[in-house]
Amino acid sequence: MFQLRNFEAIKIGLASPEKIREWSRGEVKKPETINYRTLKPERDGLFCERIFGPTKDWECHCGKYKRVRYKGVVCDRCGVEVTRSKVRRERMGHIELAAPVAHIWYVKGIPSRMGLLLDMSPRALEKVLYFVSYVVIDPGDTPLTKKQLLSEKEYRDYLDKYGNRFRAGMGAEAIKELLQEIDLEKLSKELRAEIRESTGQKRVRAIRRLEVVQAFIDSGNRPEWMILDVIPVIPPDLRPMVQLDGGRFATSDLNDLYRRVINRNNRLKKLLDLGAPDIIVRNEKRMLQEAVDALIDNGRRGRPVTGPGNRPLKSLSDMLKGKQGRFRQNLLGKRVDYSGRSVIVVGPELKVYQCGLPKEMALELFKPFVMKKLVDEGLAQHIKSAKRMVEKVKPEVWDVLEEVIKEHPVLLNRAPTLHRLGIQAFEPVLVEGRAIKLHPLVCTAYNADFDGDQMAVHVPLSMEAQAEARFLMLAANNILKPQDGKPVMTPTQDMVLGCYYLTADEEGVPGEGKYFSSPEEAIMAYQLGYIHIHAKIKVKMTKEIDGVKKSKIIETTVGKIIFNEAIPQDLGYVDRTNPETAFDLEINDLVDKSKLGKILDRVYRLHGPTKTAETLDKIKELGFRYSTKAAITVSVSDMVIPKEKEKLLKEADEMVSKIESQFRRGLISEEERYESVIRTWNMTTEKVTEALMASLDKFNPIFMMAHSGARGSKNQIRQLAGMRGLMADPSGRIIELPIRSNFREGLNVLEFFISTHGARKGLADTALRTADSGYLTRRLVDVSQDVIVREDDCGADEGIYVEEIREGNEIIEKLADRIIGRVAAEDVIDNEGNIIVRRNELINEEEAEKIEKAGITKVRIRSLLTCKSRHGVCRMCYGRDLATGELVNIGEAVGIIAAQAIGEPGTQLTMRTFHTGGVAGADITQGLPRVEELFEARKPKGLAVISEISGVVRINESKKRREVIVTDEENNISKTYLIPYGSRLKVHDGQVIQAGDELTEGSVNPHDLLKIKGIFAVQTYLLQEVQKVYRLQGVEINDKHIEVIIRQMMRKVKVEDPGDTSMLPGELIDMFKFEDENKKAIEKGLRPATGRRALLGITKAALATDSFLSAASFQETTRVLTDAAIKGKVDPLLGLKENVIIGKLIPAGTGLSRYRNISVVKKVNDQQERQDKEKEETEVKASN
């Protein structure tokens, strides 16, 4: 029995004709499919039952044997074996070709493998294969050379001249003979010698040929197997033929393609039997070659074969390729049973870990469980009657359903699933109606809203799946974002507004200054309407301190008392050891969205997920209740237009006319005029906004919404009641006429027209961005999917130094943010010599704060960039798992998490290329395209000139050009750099610079940086540049996620000189493999290879992975498979995708072998007793 768990690796290779015949159950001789009268398959045809198995379970073709009892009998009349019809999905047939045919993948691929082996150009090869020219196979004693091409006329002339003294042929037969004659070992030696001696183009060609030759030697494939004598026919159920309603048939394109091959093959056989003239036979052979080409890869050569309506037919290659191909459509993602989908509605009454499931959906999803329970409880006699009960929906079914779904979590998923929080587990609660109820706090993680979104429900069936859902995926356990470790379940919108209103205070409201003997009394007074919720009151607080009751009067409001009931009172906001502050409320000031986030972060750190979930639910209750009680609403009169607006606009007009007159007098240029006008209007807009914000009352509903972080922003208020300001035209250039009106006054026609540009651009941008961001995520996942935490400590001594990231004077990322949750690579010592953190210890928040306070500017931490693990990474180099706050567990799929962390916020990044206020010079790419440019390691737009040597700068400006000369006095070398027109210099005369420093503004080409400054510099540069793009958009991503990707981009070494190893010059090889090969060589006393680390873009890195399954399912499927087959590649199944494709458990999380092979011990005590007993027995024996 073939068991999925039983194999470790999967190998691909070329199939020999013998192998194909071995797979086959019989030869397909006729092009017929099924008989039009009986609708039964024709014998020896493409659907023949004798070859492929019966169409009906346990029934032969002629009907002599029916029923299971004849299992395995081969019918003596029709020759069909009696078995399950399922075998028609796995049994193959074959076609014996009358003439050999070349496999198009190896002829037309780039580079053409067959051409390289034979040292023929692809064009020459094509001429021979498609019967245009003859090729000399054996020149004999004639002046011809082997593999020389001869035209029809030349061939006839030579034939007349030399007769049978030479041999030439055409078509695949000739090529097959040439391939059979190749002596691979001898050719390999010759090519290695040629590589050592030659240079230039000749050497490159020799290296490429050697690569193919070496592949054939290593894999044990024979070159002549690239020519097909036999063609395999895939099982009929994989190319089905189905009857439509109208009595017509729909068939897979493959059947058409196979039929053409069989027809042409049969015709060729007949012609050969008849001894037809050579030219006719040749034409038929060419047509057969073309038919087989179309079957294998239609459209690769010449015009594709089309079906009805000029649609190209889908060949075998198309079955694998692309989003609809076998890999991505059926192997990586399948449709699953026990699932449903429906619209979502809000469920504010739910707990964080619950969701509302519609009754009828739940009944359908849990049907088998309900049926079993009905039988167990004696409500039904057997499963069949139980099924009938469920289908008729008898009343007792509902009670059973209630019991069944208790403690049985379900998974909810919303598409698009951009990160792992897009699928979470909940405990179902049955609800009436047909909509799924969703807890409002998980909306942020799902990016869901209730305007018609739909969600899918999945039921985990096995006990393991249920346990996993409950412990790892339950919404209450996923409170922190894996991106940055901040809480993802922060209250939003109404809840924030309610808490803000609750904790506000107001002057001169009823009940101000009153005293109360206890918080309860104050709350009662509020409920009876004696005091206002915002009134400042004095309350006596009583607490037990060291067993003694003490009390103190504090000033607060009823709202704050109510709010604090929901918050644990030991978060450290108040110093409880100080008698002065010991009685204060934990939160005694105004609470907005960011404050709520910080409170929850503390609750999580101090009390863990369960308490946090409780607190969240309490805050949710309060928020909703008090935003309703506050009755905050928006009306036109809330948009107060500031009185100063007129005056400010007048001043601006005067400024602009001054600028215009200066321009007319020729004092300033057009550029300067434009810039000054823009600057003036921007300043005016700012001033109007400031005046507006100052004039708004602090209880103005619009102000409250924006200020609390519930909805809207300062920017939007400005447009409602201030002025809309400057707009951009379609090209992105700012129009110098601002929109003076706001939405309350209304815009005039021209203003409205100007503002349509921005709106339209915004929509187009969003659509493009979503697609680009999705594709970027897919590439990131593919490059990093096999990065899994595989060991505790890789033992790396080195780490990297980190310091804060700055852009000019602005700090983009603080040092503390970069080191929290990382492991120190060396002791961190302050100025007094005290050790703050020891080597190999995790740095937490308090320690990071201490380090910053001690004035330490750079810290050496363990990093993924220096991790020594061969496959995946180790726990110490990764540090804290951001979603739990603990050191990462072995088996965590950190690669995928990294890809999701970088890809998910991708949609928020802007697309636009900023035009620097009309300054001539290169546009700096920003946003998503910049991230892509960095990860693909492309030569950036707006390239900066960088210095290749360290030294002193001298700037030489003449009328025609600007030069920067860098001189290194010590080594006596100098380099001159020509500065392109319009670039801004970053250096000044006499400045001392280091190699790799930028001379002009712009982006650095990472490949140049790698050459000049080395690996560490380029890794740091990529990390910091990616961080800059995200931070400027206000998105926080932890460094370690970006490090995972950069690590994958730099895994390969490019071999420069192979020495005496088996590597090839220019080959890309994994750095660990490179070290191994060299170790082996040195041990044998041979010359080791030299090479340099290569920087690959993510697409290239994903295709260069060891796993051909992963690469083939990513992009360029045919190229990857062609290459893998020739090399006889073995896929070690280390990554996630490969294992999903072949249907094994993924080697991450609970799928790791160390977690799978566990024996459960019933009771610790029993085991302990047994061990003690054994110990005693051995002691007794020893004493005897």
From Swiss-Prot:
Binding site for Mg(2+): 449, 451, 453
GO molecular-function terms, A-Z: DNA binding; DNA-directed RNA polymerase activity; magnesium ion binding; zinc ion binding
Source organism per UniProt: Thermoanaerobacter pseudethanolicus (strain ATCC 33223 / 39E) (Clostridium thermohydrosulfuricum)
Domain of life of the native organism: Bacteria
Gene3D superfamilies: 1.10.132.30, 1.10.150.390, 1.10.1790.20, 1.10.40.90, 2.40.40.20, 2.40.50.100, RNA polymerase II, clamp domain (4.10.860.120), RNA polymerase Rpb1, domain 3 (1.10.274.100)
A Pfam family assignment: RNA_pol_Rpb1_1
Cofactor(s) listed in the protein's UniProt record: Mg(2+); Zn(2+)
Chain intervals for the UniProt region annotation (Disordered): 1165-1184
Residue numbers binding Zn(2+) 1: 60, 62, 75, 78
Family, per entry: Belongs to the RNA polymerase beta' chain family.
UniProt EC number: 2.7.7.6
Descriptive protein name: DNA-directed RNA polymerase subunit beta'
